[in-house]
Structures are given as structure tokens and as C-alpha cells.
Design a protein with these regions (language model features):
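AlphaC helix of the protein kinase catalytic domain
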Residues: 110-118
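A short beta-strand motif that forms the metal-chelation/ATP-contact edge
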Residues: 99-104, 155-161
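Short, glycine/acidic-enriched loop or turn micro-motifs at the edges of active sites
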Residues: 107, 145, 163
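C-lobe/activation-segment region of protein kinase-like
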Residues: 157-235
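Conserved alphaE helix
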Residues: 121-129
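Hydrophobic residue at the +6 position relative to the catalytic HRD Asp in the kinase catalytic loop
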Residues: 143-150
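Short beta-strand micro-motifs enriched in acidic
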Residues: 91, 151-153
Length: 241
């Protein structure tokens, strides 16, 4: 195996990852090509069985594990909250071989689907997280509750970074798509209340540097307001006006 670190404890897990996966005490995800399991006090993710396009990407852009590791490192350096990635590796000299990623195990964290708490506060924190993500030049094409962990103190963390892209200045259309997608998939009930949407959008725009109330509302209302998740927010503001 070729690993990204020299730490003996991590290298030991990557020397024979299949054996460790086979004896894992807990499987978080098993979808054939992608397996996520608890291994030696860490979370291991394995990608395997991908076809020609993925092999081409591996040749020119690195394995899925390497790309996820680089993405997590970039997010950490940008100050965007994510689960620490510790190492990654793949079988040397084997075309299409599985690749493996080791991450920290946050035992007390839950994904957003299972989280229970103050929805207004969470909407605000999610707005800040996604706003910072965009402000630092990243987008995530698969924002959804299962790709967000929440720590015991209520801090949301991005996980599953396959959909992460570094694009430099984020186009407004892409930013709106990310915001609306997360709004559509947020904690049940499926749609945001006017207060939750307002908290989300205001904190999002504050993180983007849109300082004035008029500024952030002008930027997002016209496009996000066309979607079901934000229509109630627009109607509520018109009523108050």
C-alpha cells in the first residue's frame, strides 16, 4: 500500500485495510462501491469497483481517497468546519485498485437527520457554514442532512467531500443552487419556516460579506424566493411590509 503519512499507527491500518474492514465492529455505510466503517478507533472509507471514467480521473487527478483527503485539507486551511482527515492510501501498481481514507471518529456526533435541538439556531449555523464555504471559493453539489455531522455543542461539520469543488469566486447561480438544495433537504419537516429561512439567509450573507439587510435580501430573494422552500419567507415579509 502507498499511504500519505508515516504515522506507524495509521500505516498499520492501511497495510491491510480489507482485514480491518472485515472485522469492523460497526458499519456506517455499505453501498457496494463505497463502504464506511469503524476501524481501530478511526473511520475508514473505501472506494472500489469504478469504471473507465473513474480510472481516467485517478490517473490524472488522483484516487477518490486522495481527492477527498486534499479537499478536507483545503477546507481545514480555509477555516471551514469538517471532520479531520488523517491519511489515505491505495494499492501500488494496480489499475483500478480500491482506495482508502482514514478520518477521525467523532463518537458523540450525529448526522443532521438524527439531530434534535433548536432549529432556529441550527438554521443560523448552517447559513454561516455554507456562506463561509462559498466565500472561500468552494461549492458542494450534494449538500444534504446526511452529509452534515453535528457535534454535541451544535456545530455542523461537512463530511462526504466527493461533491466538493474549488471554483474560486462562486457564481451566484451556483451559490443559489447550493442554498436552495440544502433548504429543500433540511431537517424534517422538509420545508423551512419563515423564521428559519430568514436566520439561514441572513447568516449566510453575513458570512459572504453582504453587510446590509437590503443587500442580502436583494441578492437572494429574487432567485431563492422562487423555490417552494422560500416562498413562505417572501410572503411573510410582504405581509409585514
Amino acid at each position: 500500500m502507498r499511504a500519505s503519512v508515516d504515522d506507524p499507527a495509521l500505516a498499520h491500518l492501511l497495510c491491510d485495510p480489507e482485514t480491518h474492514l472485515a472485522h469492523s465492529p460497526r458499519i456506517f455505510k455499505n453501498e457496494g462501491r463505497c463502504v464506511v466503517a469503524l476501524v481501530g478507533g478511526y473511520v475508514m472509507k473505501r472506494w472500489s469497483g469504478y469504471g473507465g471514467l473513474e480510472r481516467w480521473k485517478t490517473r490524472w487527478r488522483g484516487t477518490r481517497a486522495a481527492r477527498a483527503g486534499w479537499a478536507a485539507t483545503a477546507l481545514e486551511q480555509a477555516g471551514v468546519a469538517t471532520v479531520p482527515v488523517l491519511a489515505w492510501g491505495t494499492r501500488e501498481g494496480v489499475i483500478g485498485a480500491p482506495s482508502y481514507l482514514l478520518m477521525a471518529y467523532l463518537a458523540d456526533a450525529v448526522d443532521l437527520r438524527s439531530w434534535q435541538g433548536n432549529r432556529l439556531e441550527m438554521a443560523e449555523r448552517l447559513g454561516g457554514l455554507i456562506g463561509l464555504l462559498h466565500e472561500r471559493g468552494f461549492t458542494h453539489r450534494d449538500l444534504k442532512p446526511s452529509n452534515l455531522l453535528v457535534t454535541p455543542d451544535g456545530c455542523p461539520l461537512l463530511i462526504d467531500l466527493d461533491g466538493l469543488r474549488s471554483v474560486g469566486p462562486v457564481p451566484r447561480s451556483r451559490a443559489i443552487a447550493d442554498v436552495v438544495k440544502l433548504g429543500r433537504r433540511m431537517v424534517a419537516p422538509s420545508s423551512l419556516t419563515p423564521s428559519e429561512a430568514s436566520r439561514f439567509l441572513s447568516r449566510y450573507c453575513l458570512a459572504r460579506g453582504f453587510r446590509g439587510r437590503r443587500n442580502w435580501w436583494t441578492v437572494l430573494r429574487e432567485e431563492a424566493g422562487r423555490h417552494d422552500e422560500f416562498r413562505t419567507l417572501r410572503a411573510a415579509r410582504k405581509t409585514r411590509a
